[in-house]
Amino acid sequence: MELNTLAPAPGAKSSKKRVGRGIGSGLGKTGGRGHKGQKSRSGGSVKPGFEGGQMPIQRRLPKFGFTSRKAMVTAEVNLAEIAKVDGDTVELATLKAAGLVRKNVLHAKVIKSGELSRAVTVKGLKVTKGAREAIEAAGGKIEG
């Protein structure tokens, strides 16, 4: 088998319908667009969200909330992922090196999810109460 000899199985592909090519094709004359009206004209599409002149729903409803910019550079790391980090200390740089958080992350928080079997020192990361207990139970400690 060669790349240049690959072909779909016979009957697997059907040829596309050519519109406006005679009555016998089933898509002649109007080409499947029906008679008259905006959508039958060329360029006659209606933009998404347009409701025929009625005030659109995205303008009828009030604005609310905002997107936190800090949330974009914050990551959550669970205990099972911390166990994958090489070495005894876990900090933002080691998490990035292990590929557990993206490069643009500035803040990280350790959450209690999964198991931690070895002692690690967590530096400069926020830690939830449950995760703190699990780290200390495994013989680890939390610094700053």
Swiss-Prot record:
Pfam families the record matches: Ribosomal_L27A
Report whether Endoplasmic reticulum shows up as a keyword of the record. Answer: no
Q: What InterPro entries does this protein map onto?
A: Ribosomal_uL15, Ribosomal_uL15/eL18, Ribosomal_uL15/eL18_sf, Ribosomal_uL15_bac-type
According to the UniProt entry, where is the signal peptide?
A: none
GO terms, molecular function: rRNA binding; structural constituent of ribosome
Keyword vocabulary terms for this entry? Ribonucleoprotein, Ribosomal protein, RNA-binding, rRNA-binding
Q: Which GO terms describe its cellular component?
A: cytosolic large ribosomal subunit
Does the UniProt entry include the keyword RNA-binding? yes
State the superkingdom. Answer: Bacteria
Q: Which GO terms describe its biological process?
A: translation
Segments carrying the region annotation (Disordered) are 1-56
Q: Biased-composition ranges for Gly residues?
A: 21-31
What role is this protein assigned? Binds to the 23S rRNA.
Spell out the subunit comment.
Part of the 50S ribosomal subunit.
The family note in this entry says: Belongs to the universal ribosomal protein uL15 family.
- Designated name of the protein: Large ribosomal subunit protein uL15
Could you tell me which species this protein originates from? Idiomarina loihiensis (strain ATCC BAA-735 / DSM 15497 / L2-TR)
